[in-house]
Amino acid sequence: MWRLKIADGNNNPYLYSTNNFVGRQTWEFDPNYGTQEERDEVEQARQHFWNNRHQFKATGDVLWRMQFIREKRFKQTIPQVKIEDGEEISYDKVTATLRRSVHLLAALQADDGHWPAENTGPMFFIQPLVICLYITGHLDRVFPKEHKKEILRYLYTQQNEDGGWGLHIEGQSIMFGTIMSYVCMRLLGEGPDGGLNGACTKARKWILDHGSVLASPSWGKIYLTILGVHEWEGCNPLPPEFWILPSIFPMHPAKMWCYCRLIYMPMSYLYGRRFVGPITPLVLQLREELYSQSYNDIKWKSTRHLVVKEDLHYPHPWLQDLMWDGLYIFTEPLLTRWPFSKLREKALKTTINHIHYEDENSRYITIGAVEKSLCMLACWDEDPDGVCFKKHLARIPDYIWVSEDGLKMQSFGSQLWDASLAIQALLATDLNHDIEPILRKGHDFIKASQVKDNPSGDFKSMYRHITKGSWTFSDQDHGWQTSDCTTEGLKCCLLLSKMSAEIVGEKMQPEQFYDAVNLILSLQCKNGGEAGWEPAGESNWLEFLNPSELFEDIVLEHDSVECTATGMQALVIFKKLYPKHRREEIEKFLKDACGYLEKVQMQDGSWYGEWGICFTYGTCFALGGMEAIGKTYENCEAIRRAVNFLLTTQRNDGGWGESYRSSPKKKYVPLEGNRSNLVQTACALMGLIRSKQEERDPTPLHRAAKLLINSQMENGDFPQEETGGVFKKNCLLHYPMYRNIYTLWALGEYRKKVLPQPTKV
């Protein structure tokens, strides 16, 4: 039986940590763990998800929840409440709903203070890892029998009815997701016509019906090439010389978005090395299975720009294809011949040094799932028995997650993000007696997770920004600063610093607050918006160089509504507690941020959310930022327009429901059937409360609160619905804790600001 372990280094000599592994979450399979009744409960959850897999793609993430509830002997003792039609919502019923949520949240908190949860959704994380482990010969050791069984379960469960897989779990089938999943199944031991319900046969038919893997997008071509099922001649060039360009060059790596930079870094190394894994009998079989013509007859040069329409979210401009052709026809032949080959040798050495630097500064976690597999493979290519590769292997468990739909690979974990939101939700309830022990543990986790130092050495020469004082998305070992995680972590610690240390523990030192503020200020763009990871400032025209057909806006760092709004909230709280520290800079930040929000507001009054779905989510955040600086419905046209947007998109049942398709389409798209989504309902409710809707007409608030209250389940949980997160406008991320956090937060604000408190007799 599977179980989750917290903050455990497992005494592995190749693991090291900056804070004793606080926040680390790893799964292990123990054949002797659990009773038969508990195993049956897990199987029931798996079967239930399987039976409904085509209606609900996002898991409830119930396996670890079952484990924690058992271990803590949790039982919901507060009676469930419902609001009948025509009934006025009472303060006491909302209180009961909140207390039920809080009691469950307490049971789900890990010993180190965070809330475990999967952070998955893309259908291109686990597959490249399996490919790289197969190439290196470590697949069976890293993923023994039970691991393989659960990976296959995941692939079967998430397969679409037409036989393919999407870019993410809710997406329509595309070539990239389908070829990666097909190859993964074959590497895990399934035959060409194997798999549950003919999974491999259906997938191969989809691939061949859509032009074969020759029509794969560029990432698919690269992964197949390193496996030996495609040729480098059929890929656009990724010259490692990119990493030795002069800094004045417009396309210098220092000017790129960090994820783009760190994905193409190992890709360019492998390209420069013309790396290909061992050509095994299975690889030769795949060459026969995945093409509609003989492998040896393929004219690879003519296939470089082929991409099936299902994968073409961002078509290359003709000028970009002309650039690739120039590199392919003229530059590459030169760089592979003496004396220019000396330049390639230098470039490869520089590139692998950058890879090692990033590995060391993330404790071999790397910045994310895509980079992890590629950097690990580059290290293996350099030295198959080297320490670097062994350190990479030791960090694979940090990425693995097991749920009712099987074993998958995470983006890298949302521990800090979820914990900081959960603590603010708890504070909104004002249930001091119920939440005090939870707050103390959560406070300890957030304090222990703040990054204490900048990257090692001359980090600017390695294209890195400051990290000291920041918080990451996951844990301290990860090491990569993000502005919104820093602002949410800062908000929590500032709010908790106002409470008694006997209740929530010692507050952070002022210098730690100052370091966080310094990072937030450093990431404001010229237009007033806040960037996510590193300062943004390059001209947007460089986005025409986006080499990926699957994503949008990946070349440069960009600002976002959410990062800007949370930065405003955090700095307003900070300014009240530390009024003399960098006051003028903070006031300028707030003024410019307000101007940015007003400028990027959509015509219908909404704001586009970069990290959640989509206009509902972005509008909630923007209203929070505007409220923080004193903007009101009466004095701000932007707020009036935003309120109108929320009121006009409310559903008949009192909720809100927006489709993930809003993100790629960049226009509001409701859920099919005018359904509501509880997380979006909670976000919209909070947004309206931030505009003081209760002073104008509380009816929409009551209707939303009624839906939330009546949706609470017997144990205090809320049902899992559609996936809640998104990135780069076209791919989803699943945040299962959102259903607990945002519902609690919204109802806490509703009780505090909308309902009159009963008079004490």
Curated annotation (Swiss-Prot):
Its EC number is 5.4.99.51. SUPFAM superfamilies: Terpenoid cyclases/Protein prenyltransferases (SSF48239). GO terms for cellular component: lipid droplet. Keywords: Isomerase, Repeat. The active site is at residue 484. Disulfide bonds: none annotated. GO terms for biological process: triterpenoid biosynthetic process. The keyword Chaperone does not apply. It is an enzyme of class 5 (isomerase). It comes from the Eukaryota. PFTB repeats lie at residues 148-189, 639-680. GO terms for molecular function: beta-amyrin synthase activity; oxidosqualene cyclase activity. It catalyses: (S)-2,3-epoxysqualene = baccharis oxide. NCBIfam families: squalene_cyclas (TIGR01787). Belongs to the terpene cyclase/mutase family. Oxidosqualene cyclase converting (3S)-2,3-epoxy-2,3-dihydrosqualene to baccharis oxide, a triterpene with a 3,10-oxide bridge in the A-ring. Also mediates conversion of other triterpenoids at a much lower level. This is Baccharis oxide synthase.
